[in-house]
Amino acid sequence: MGQKIHPLGFRLGVIKDHKSCWYADAKRYPELLQEDRRIRQYVEKNLANAGIADIRIERKADQVDISIHTARPGVVVGRGGTGIEQLRLGLQKALGGQRQIRINVIEVARVDADANLIAEYIAQQLERRVSFRRVVRQAIQRAQRAEVKGIKIQVSGRLNGAEIARTEWVREGRVPLHTLRADIDYSYKTASTIYGILGVKVWIFKGEIIPGQEEIAAAVPAQAPRRQQRRRQQFEDRSSEG
C-alpha cells in the first residue's frame, strides 16, 4: 500500500508534521479548515513566480502565523518590504474579520532537492513545449547535484502531442515508499498544453529519519571534518531509454 497512499499523509505523526497546526472546537473547525485552503490558494496565485515550496499555518487566538518557504525570498518580500505588506493586506481583505496576520519568509536551502520546486520546473518546461524526456533528464541531473538519495519522476498525458495518452516514469537511486522512516518528499503539478493537461509527479528520497535520532545527534559534539573528501553518490541516467 506504500505505492498507492500519499507519501506525506502516510508518514504524518511518524516523521512528518501537519502543514496546519492549530486546535478548534467542532463548530469552528470546518470554517478554519476552509480558511486555510483560501490562504494557500491566495498565496500560490499571487506568488506564482516566487518558487513557493511550502506554506505552513499556525493559529493563536485571533492571530494567524504564515510561514512561506520559497526559493526566491526577494520576490516575496519586495523592495523595502512592500511585497510582503501587500500580501498581508490582501489576505486580511480576503479573509475578513479583525485577525492579525504575521508572515514569515524562509529561504529554501536546497532548491534542487525540493519535490515541489522540481515538479513546478518540469510543468513550466512542458508548457513551453520542451520534450518531456529532455526535461526529466535535466531535473534528474539537478537532483543528483543536490546529492539526494533517490528520485522518481512520472509524467502522464498526451506526451509530445501523441494521439494516445500514456504514462512514462524514470527512477534513479532508491525511493522506498513503504518504509515509514524514509524521508520522502512528494509533489504533484499539472501542465496546461495545447494538447491537454499533463500530470507531473515527483518523489524524492532524502534519507532515513529515526525518531529520537535528532536529540542524540544534538547531544554529541560535532567532530572535526575529515581531510579526505567523501565520494559523491553516482546515479545511472536511464531516462533516454524506451
UniProtKB/Swiss-Prot annotation:
Regions of compositional bias (Basic and acidic residues) in chain numbering: 233-242
Output the Gene Ontology terms for molecular function: mRNA binding; rRNA binding; structural constituent of ribosome
Q: Which domain of life is it from?
A: Bacteria
Q: Where is this region: Disordered?
A: 220-242
Q: What Pfam families does the record tag this protein with? A: KH_2, Ribosomal_S3_C
Stretches assigned to the KH type-2 domain: 39-109
**Per the UniProt entry, what are the Gene Ontology biological process annotations, in alphabetical order?**
translation
Keywords (A to Z) from UniProt: Ribonucleoprotein, Ribosomal protein, RNA-binding, rRNA-binding
- Which protein family is named in the record? Belongs to the universal ribosomal protein uS3 family.
> By its UniProt entry, which NCBIfam families does this protein fall under?
rpsC_bact
Q: How does it assemble?
A: Part of the 30S ribosomal subunit. Forms a tight complex with proteins S10 and S14.
Which protein is depicted? Small ribosomal subunit protein uS3
Which species? Answer: Microcystis aeruginosa (strain NIES-843 / IAM M-2473)
